[in-house]
Regions:
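Inter-helical turn/loop segments and adjacent helix faces that build the functional surface
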Residues: 83-96, 147-152
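Rossmann-like NAD(P)H-binding beta-loop-alpha module
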Residues: 19-42, 63, 74, 82-88
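Short, small-residue-biased leader/transition segments that mark boundaries at the very start
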Residues: 1-5
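A conserved active-site cap/scaffold subdomain adjacent to cofactor or substrate pockets
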Residues: 125-179
Length: 179
């Protein structure tokens, strides 16, 4: 008998085109299982799958991945807020993020940010109708706790997690005016 625990990443895109899969295993993993998981994984120039020896290793890799994404999303949110408070429009901010793409300083999160900034419904920017509230599922907190336990400084991840917690502590989001 073999034990295989896996975690995946990709959201909607992963559901459509296959997820990135992180497999943790306790003992040797069979070639059949490797092939099956590889077949359903996302593809770039290779299969988007990693095999990590050690029970729970796949979950650990996913946790660290999510912590890094927390930091990236917080950086994007801070850039957005600075530009917005500087009276830049959604279109101007989207153009700023597009320029990062042209300078090879892009990421998937930056690419979707410029798309989100341009989305309208009934002539109104969708983003302007969303309250600045960010929930979490616990992996950011777990990443912070793990980094503290291992004595590894992760100030960007901690600050990003803290910003999410603080966003939940606002009494009345209707009082906030970004314009």
């Amino acid at each position: 008998r073999q034990m295989c625990i896996r975690d995946s990443s990709g959201g909607e895109e992963g559901a459509r085109n296959g997820p990135a899969i992180m497999v943790g295993y306790k003992n040797k993993i069979s070639e059949d299982l490797k092939n099956t998981l590889s077949a359903i994984s996302a593809k770039t120039d290779q299969d988007c799958i990693g095999f990590y020896e050690g029970y729970g290793s796949g979950h650990f890799i996913k946790m660290v991945h999510n912590g890094i994404e927390y930091a990236e999303m917080q950086l994007i949110a801070e850039i957005y807020e600075i530009l917005r408070r500087s009276k830049k429009t959604n279109e101007e901010i989207a153009n700023f993020f597009d320029n990062l793409k042209e300078e090879n300083r892009s990421s998937y999160l930056i690419e979707i940010t410029s798309k989100i900034l341009r989305q309208k419904k009934d002539g109104v920017y969708v983003l302007d109708e969303i309250k600045p509230f960010a929930s979490n599922k616990g992996t950011g907190k777990l990443t912070v706790e793990t980094s503290l336990n291992l004595k590894v400084p992760t100030p960007s991840i901690y600050a990003a997690y803290d910003a999410r917690v603080q966003s939940n502590n606002k009494n009345d989001w209707d009082e906030i005016n970004m314009e």
